[in-house]
UniProtKB/Swiss-Prot annotation:
The modification N6-succinyllysine is found at residue 273. It is found in: Mitochondrion matrix. Keywords: Acetylation, Endonuclease, Hydrolase, Metal-binding, Mitochondrion, Nuclease, Phosphoprotein, RNA-binding, Zinc. Coiled coil: none annotated. Pfam families: BLACT_WH, Lactamase_B. The modification N6-acetyllysine is found at residues 102, 282. It comes from Rattus norvegicus (Rat). Monomer. This is Endoribonuclease LACTB2.
Length: 288
């Protein structure tokens, strides 16, 4: 069972978590959004989903409670549970200037429209520094979950805002497994102490959690390889493999499990360990 999280919680002298009020199987307790800094204007990391008035109320309450305003908005990646609240924030939380909303570009590049186009993204790059009173954030390009995903290193705390690259509970989904594994290895090199994840509770041993994620994916890959090694003459569909490998996963997570399996299969095919055939549905078998 997911740990209970307060809707507004001060996590450190410079980090306040405001829960997105959008709980679900994919979002856990909801999206974690963060106010970062110590001054009268702070950085907001992520924005939750569109049309969640409870979140806007919580964010207003947090701004009032800590006597602060939003300096700018950083979006860790394009998914709607992280970028979807931008329009509602701009519409319902007054600011003395137009909100500056920053993120990494999609890769390959594509046009991104916020709402009906009143706001536009300001694109930032890997290694950029974003500063506010009491906090310095360094942009870390961490593709894999999405092609535009970024984590942010809070230098004053040696802490990482991990977006959906690493979650406080369970594991995440990804678009490209090779990119994702490289991003995990890059985050490991940072040697951070703490992770503030995009969903779930704070992670207080960053290195152990990242190593756990890397080990989990390597173990999953080994499970898949073992199935093919033990059945050299047979071919398997994604759903057949899911029944063998994700035996205890509840039905509402079957789609996510199959998505992750498919990405493992693509990586193994790229590595030359298996090949795919159409029969008539796509299946895979071991490369002899």
């Amino acid at each position: 069972m997911a740990a209970a999280l307060q809707r507004i919680e001060q996590l450190s002298s410079r980090v306040v978590r405001v829960l997105g009020c959008n709980p679900g199987p994919m979002t856990l307790q909801g999206t974690n959004t963060y106010l970062v800094g110590t001054g009268s204007r702070r950085i907001l990391i992520d924005t939750g989903e569109p049309s969640v008035p409870e979140y806007i109320s919580c964010l207003k309450q947090a701004l009032a409670e800590f006597d602060t305003a939003i300096q700018e908005i950083l979006v860790t990646h394009w998914h709607r549970d992280h970028s979807g609240g931008i329009v509602d924030i701009c519409k319902n939380i007054s600011n003395d200037a137009t909100y500056c909303i920053k993120k990494l570009r999609r890769n390959p590049q594509k046009e991104e429209i916020i709402g009906s186009g009143e706001q536009q993204y300001v694109y930032i790059e890997d290694g950029d520094l974003i500063k506010t009173e009491g906090a310095t954030l360094r942009v870390l390009y961490t593709p894999g979950h999405t092609d535009d995903h970024m984590a942010l290193l809070l230098e004053e705390e040696n802490a990482i805002f991990s977006g959906d690259c690493i979650l406080g509970e369970g594991t995440t989904i990804f678009e490209d497994l090779s990119d994702y594994m490289n991003s995990l290895k890059d985050l490991l090199k940072v040697k951070a102490n703490i992770i503030y994840p995009g969903h779930g509770p704070v992670i207080h041993n960053a290195e152990a959690k990242i190593l756990e994620y890397i080990s989990h994916r390597n173990n999953r890959e080994e499970q898949i390889i073992t199935v093919f090694r033990d059945n050299l003459e047979e071919s398997f569909s994604v759903s057949e493999l899911r029944k063998m490998i994700y035996k205890n996963v509840p039905e509402n997570l079957h789609k996510m499990a199959e998505h992750n399996l498919l990405l493992h299969l693509r990586k193994l095919e790229k590595d030359g360990k298996i090949f795919s055939i159409a029969s008539p549905a796509k299946k895979w078998r071991a490369s002899l």
